[in-house]
Amino acid sequence: MIYEGKAITVKALESGIVELNFDLKGESVNKFNRLTLNELRQAVDTIKADASIKGVIVSSGKDVFIVGADITEFVDNFKLPDAELVAGNLEANKIFSDFEDLNVPTVAAINGIALGGGLEMCLAADYRVMAASAKIGLPEVKLGIYPGFGGTVRLPRLIGADNAIEWIAAGKENRAEDALKVGAVDAVVAPDKLKDAALALVKRAISGEFDYKAKRQPKLEKLKLNAIEQMMAFETAKGFVAGQAGPNYPAPVEAIKTIQKAANFGRDKALEVEAAGFVKLAKTSAAQSLIGLFLNDQELKKKAKAYDEIAKDVKQAAVLGAGIMGGGIAYQSASKGTPILMKDINEHGIEQGLAEAAKLLVGRVDKGRMTAAKMAEVLNGIRPTLSYGDFGNVDLVVEAVVENPKVKQIVLAEVEGQVKEDTILASNTSTISISLLAKALKRPENFVGMHFFNPVHMMPLVEVIRGEKSSELAVATTVAYAKKMGKNPIVVNDCPGFLVNRVLFPYFGGFAKLVSAGVDFVRIDKIMEKFGWPMGPAYLMDVVGIDTGHHGRDVMAEGFPDRMKDDRRSAVDVLYEAKRLGQKNGKGFYAYETDKKGKQKKVADPSVLEVLKPIVYEQREVTDEDIINWMMIPLCLETVRCLEDGIVETAAEADMGLVYGIGFPPFRGGALRYIDSIGVAEFVALADQYADLGALYHPTAKLREMAKNGQSFFG
C-alpha cells in the first residue's frame, strides 16, 4: 500500500500503475469532507514524490463514485469572513490542480453517480471512462451556489461553453450516452468492464499512443472563443436562463457570468474568478435557505427510515373511493410496485378512477418515461371492484371518500369488518380529527391519517397523522408505504387541519382580511407570486375549490375559535353562495377558459366585483409590504404554534411540510427559516405592528421569550 487513509488509499496495480481509491469509512457514500480533502492532498503529494509511478487510475470502493461535497460542513464554512472562505476554496482547488498537473497520465473510472465535487475530481483527470449505468452532473445551483472545485473552469474548456452552461445552469444528472456525446467522458463501457477499460487506456497513454499532455492542455488555457462568439454564447444564455430561473434564484446566471469573466484567463486565474463568485453566492439568503432545505430533507429521510425497523411490508393495498383522488392514489401505488384494489359504490366512480390512472400513464408513455409494456403492467396492478370480496388479504386500506366525518365513520367501520385483524386503515382526510374518526372503530390502534395532496402524482408530501390511539406499528407501516409510493412522509399529531392546512388557513385568513379591506385580489396575487409563491392566494383558492376552502375554513374556525373564527362574512362565503366554486365549474375569483391544448387558463371576470361588494367593509390604503405581512405573519405564527403544541416534532419537519405541501417559496426555506432570516426579535416587533388585525397576528409567549433571549429556530 503506497498510501492508506480513512477515505483514500493508493495501491500499486501493475507496471507502475497505481489506483487512487475513494472509500470513506463508516459512510454509505463517498463525499468531499475535510477529511477526504486532507487525505487527497496527502495522496497527491505521495504520488508526485514517487518517481516509479507511471500512471494513475481514480476509482471508488462504493456503488457511487462521489456524491459531492459534504453539505453539512457548508453551514459553518459559509459563516467565515469572505477572505477566509476564498482562501480556503483556493487551497482546496490547489489539490485538484496539483492532481491535474501530475507528470503521469490519469484516468477516472466512474462506476456510479459522480456529482458536484465528484465530477470536478474527474474533470481534473486526463481521461474519463464511465460505466453505462452511471450518471454525472453539477447540481450545485439547486443549493443556491455553483460548482466551486473548478467545475466552471474545466467543464467549458472540455465540452464547450454552450454545453457547459446547459449542464451547470440546469444542475441535472446526465446519463453516460449524453456525457459521451458532448465529450465529458472519453468512453462508456459495461460496468463489469470498467476497471479493465481504465487500465487499457492508461497503458496506451503511458506508451505514448495517446498524448495525455496534449489532452490536458485545453483545460489549462483560456476558452477557445473569440469576442463575438463569447458575446453570442454568454449574453443569449444569460437572458434565457434568467427568464427560466427568475430573480429569486441567482446562482444559474451568476455561474454564466463567472464562466464569461474567466473565459480569457488560463486555469489558475480562472479559478480565482470562480472562488470570488462562489463566495458571493454562498453569502446569499437564497443559498442559506436552499442549503437549509437540503439538510432538512436529509433529516426527514433519516426520520422516515427509522420507522422501517418496525413497519410491516404492504404487499397488497386498497383504496376506498375511486374518482380522481382514488385514481391518483391507485396510480401512485401500482406504478411503484404495490398492487391495489380500487373500490367504489358505483361504476361511474370506478370509470373516473381508471380514467385518471390511464391518463397519467399515457402521459408518461408519450413523454418516453415509460414503455407501453410497463403501462400495461401498472394497469394490471389496479383492480377495480364494487364489493369487498377480495379485501381479506389487504395489508393497508386508504379511505378517500367525501370529506364528511359521518360518511367517513360509516365507511371505515364497514371496511374494518371486511379485512384482517392487523390490516391498517388510513384516512385521506385533510382536516377531520383522526381521533374523532377512530371512535367508530373496534381497533383504533390500527387507524391513522394519510393525507395526500392534490394532484397526488405531483405533490411530494404525505402527512401521516397519529391519532390518540394509533399504534407505532400503524404509523410506521403507513410511513413505509408512503415512501414506497415515492412520497416524502412527515408524521404529525392530530389536530384540526394537522400541520399543512392548519397553517394554510390563517394565510387565507390574511387574504380574506385584505379583500374585505378593499384591496384588489389580482394585486394581492401578483405581489405574493413575486414574493415567491407558485400562485397567488385567490388563484390557489380557485384551484383548491371554493367549496373545499369554505368547508375547511369552518372546520378550522370550530377547532381554533379564538383566532380563526370571524363573525363577518368574507370573500369565500359570497363566492360559495354565488356557486362560483373555482376551476371546477369555471368561475371563482377568476373565470376559466380552455386553451387549444385543452388546459384551463384563468382570465379576468369583472362580474366578480359585484359578488364581492357586500364583504368589502372599508377602503384601506396598504403598501406591497403590508400585503406580504398581512399574509405571511399569520402563516408563520401558526407554524410556530404547531411546533410549540407538538403537532410537528422539529422545525425542519415544519418547514419541509410547507415547502412540499403548499409550495412555500424554497429560496426562503420555510416559515421558521423565514422568521430566522428576519430575526426572531424583529419578526415579533413586526407582528406587533399588525396586532389590531386580530389574534392571528399575536406572537406566542414562547416566541417572545425566544426574541428576548436572542434565540433562533435553526441556530
UniProtKB/Swiss-Prot annotation:
Annotated active site: 451 (for 3-hydroxyacyl-coa dehydrogenase activity)
Residues that hold NAD(+) according to the record: 325, 344, 401-403, 408, 430, 454
A biological process term (GO) from this entry: fatty acid beta-oxidation
Keywords: Fatty acid metabolism, Isomerase, Lipid degradation, Lipid metabolism, Lyase, Multifunctional enzyme, NAD, Oxidoreductase
Transmembrane segments: none
Disulfide links within the chain: none
Record's catalysed reaction(s): a (3S)-3-hydroxyacyl-CoA + NAD(+) = a 3-oxoacyl-CoA + NADH + H(+); a (3S)-3-hydroxyacyl-CoA = a (2E)-enoyl-CoA + H2O; a 4-saturated-(3S)-3-hydroxyacyl-CoA = a (3E)-enoyl-CoA + H2O; (3S)-3-hydroxybutanoyl-CoA = (3R)-3-hydroxybutanoyl-CoA
One GO CC term on file: fatty acid beta-oxidation multienzyme complex
Domain of life of the source: Bacteria
Sites annotated Important for catalytic activity: 120, 140
Presence of the UniProt keyword Methyltransferase in the record: no
EC number from the UniProt entry: 4.2.1.17, 5.1.2.3, 5.3.3.8, 1.1.1.35
Pathway annotation: Lipid metabolism; fatty acid beta-oxidation
Record SUPFAM superfamilies: 6-phosphogluconate dehydrogenase C-terminal domain-like (SSF48179), ClpP/crotonase (SSF52096), NAD(P)-binding Rossmann-fold domains (SSF51735)
PROSITE patterns: 3HCDH (PS00067), ENOYL_COA_HYDRATASE (PS00166)
Region (Enoyl-CoA hydratase/isomerase): 1-190
Region 3-hydroxyacyl-CoA dehydrogenase, annotated ranges: 312-715
Residues annotated for substrate binding in this entry: 297, 501, 660
Signal peptide: none
Family label: In the N-terminal section; belongs to the enoyl-CoA hydratase/isomerase family.
Subunit structure: Heterotetramer of two alpha chains (FadB) and two beta chains (FadA).
Name of the protein in its database record: Fatty acid oxidation complex subunit alpha
Origin species: Pseudomonas fluorescens (strain ATCC BAA-477 / NRRL B-23932 / Pf-5)
Lineage start: Bacteria, Pseudomonadati, Pseudomonadota, Gammaproteobacteria, Pseudomonadales
Gene: fadB
